[in-house]
Each structure stands twice: as C-alpha cells, then as structure tokens.
C-alpha cells in the first residue's frame, strides 16, 4: 500500500551511462515520467557510470536524510598528473613508474583508510566565493580550496599485474563527499610518480546497489512498479516511532508527538509511521522535562491509510 497521494513518489535507482551529466539524467527522467519534482543524490562525473539514485515527488524533500556512504570500482593509472586528476585532463607531468609488489601495495593503501582530510579537485561542484570550482577551472583559474573531512572504510585491490605495474583496479567504500579522482591523485603524490583516475563505476550509493538499478532505456519502456522504492524503505536506517490514529490530525498540523522514554539525542532524526507507513520525519527535542518528536517534513498522504 502506498500511503502517499501520488503513486509516482519515491526513489528510483538509475544506472547512469558514461557521457551524460547527472543533470542530463534528471532532465531525461523528467521528460519520460512527466514529473517536475525530481532530484538526484550525489553527482557522478560525465565520464563515470553507475548508481545515480533520483527522488520523485515528495521524496525530494527527504534527499538530505538518505544514507550518503558510497562504493566505487576505479582504475588507477600511475606515472601521470593531469589538471583534472583523471584521464580526460591535460597532462602536466609525467614520471617513471615504480615497481611495487602486491604486498607493498596493500601496505601502502592502508595509509589511505580511515578518517582524513581531502582537498576537492578544481573540476568539482563545490562552491568557493559564490562560484562552483569547475567554473573557475573552465577559465583556467585555480583557487584555494578548503579541505573536507572524509572517511575511507575500505580499499581492496581487485586487479594487479606485476608485468603492468602502472595500472590497478580498486574497490573503495567511503563516505559521501569523497572524490575518487583525488584519492588516486593523493596516492600518486605519496609514491612521487603521480597518478590519475581512469574509468569509474559507482556500485552503491547508500541503500541503492548496481544490481538493482534500471537504465533510462528501461524507464522509457515503462516504469516497473518494483523499481520505485518507497521513502519508508530508503529511510530504514533512522529510528522509528508509531503514531496513534487519534494523533494523526495533530501530526498533519506539525504538532510535536510524545516519545517513549529512551536516551534520545537532541536533533536526532526519527521516522514517524502509522501502521508501518511513513507519514513524516521529525527530530527529537527535550521540552518540559520530556522527549518529544517535532515533525520537520510532513508528507501529504491519502486518507485510504485509515481504512
């Protein structure tokens, strides 16, 4: 049962092809589905492929609450530095490639796991001084960029050949906001020979996985109902509270709801469900010596949920 007013509200896991921007994918989805309210979760470079989840209708209001962790498979190419940190850029330096054993590589990659600081590349969409970095890059201007905290959970070597030491295939699990091209660049700087990213595939974005994605061509042939994921499924990582039927009118008005005794954290996001259906998301607040859930995003739902 879909509690929302429109059947075309939820999340779609799109398989972005190389050669399209994330904006292109959203624009095409708008035309196919005839839905204006569409937003994507996490830009993919035009040359990259893989998982690009999009939100439809009211689900666009929930994008910020979707898990942001990502998984990638990437090609690392040694011996070059480019102005874009990937294979599409202009080569600015070339260096001899060192000979490393697989064991030496595994030890080196351990240095790039865990919490660290990363400086976004000039070709990214990060805003500095009111402009996107890629806008500066197009003008040939390099500006100082503030570093960002990221987390690399895992780096595994998928493919390595001693007779071709200039190329590795890596699997990376990381936090949202991590730039794989910059990770490749930093590895090259650590080795002193430079490195760039070749191809890139995003295999997972939050709960969305490559094997469950659909292509734009499939979407053109008709939206399969099982491909539309409900907001409640996507936000399963958030704690849940059940709303009593008599409190539904108060919820619609955005009034705070009493939370059962628990060690809540101020500002913690909570799913607000009725009969297992997501109707709103709120935040825990401490007020009048008790915990309340203050609705922040109340969805418009069909009255059929009361039947």
From Swiss-Prot:
It holds the Pfam family TruB_C_2. It is an enzyme of class 5 (isomerase). This is tRNA pseudouridine synthase B. NCBIfam families: TruB (TIGR00431). Responsible for synthesis of pseudouridine from uracil-55 in the psi GC loop of transfer RNAs. Gene3D superfamilies: Pseudouridine synthase. Belongs to the pseudouridine synthase TruB family. Type 1 subfamily. The keyword Isomerase applies. InterPro entries: PsdUridine_synth_cat_dom_sf, PsdUridine_synth_N, tRNA_psdUridine_synth_TruB, TruB_C. The gene is truB. The active site is at residue 45. Keywords: Isomerase, tRNA processing. CDD domains: PseudoU_synth_EcTruB. It catalyses: uridine(55) in tRNA = pseudouridine(55) in tRNA. GO terms for biological process: mRNA pseudouridine synthesis; tRNA modification. Transmembrane segments: none annotated. Its EC number is 5.4.99.25. One of its GO terms (molecular function) is tRNA pseudouridine(55) synthase activity.
